[in-house]
Amino acid sequence: DSYSYPKANTSGCTAEACSLQAHKEELAATGYEIIGVSKDKQALQKKFAETKGLQFPLIADTETTLLQELGCWGEKVTCGRKTIGILRTTYLVNEEGVIEKIFTPKEIKTKIHAEQILDYIHQ
């Protein structure tokens, strides 16, 4: 389970990360590990993980190379304004490296995102 998030320590990203952390063991029991990716610098990622008690890896993709390859970097509308940035996306990748499901920005509800993932896995 890999997910991209726009910015550490913002309300939506914090809600999403905390949801995933709260259900980390349930996700692990189904064979999925959590990996977060954002454009934030490593120091901010570390502080975010420490202050929120996140016990999964956070990748600092400051050059957006991985984010672009994953299709998580592009045009979006924020507060009625078009910008280029991270598109909040989650990929469920199985043990063979095959993408089973992509949760798009329109599908993701940050506060209950882990439950959304578990619901999909258990359907």
Language model segments and positions:
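Chalcogenol-based redox active-site neighborhoods
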Residues: 1-123
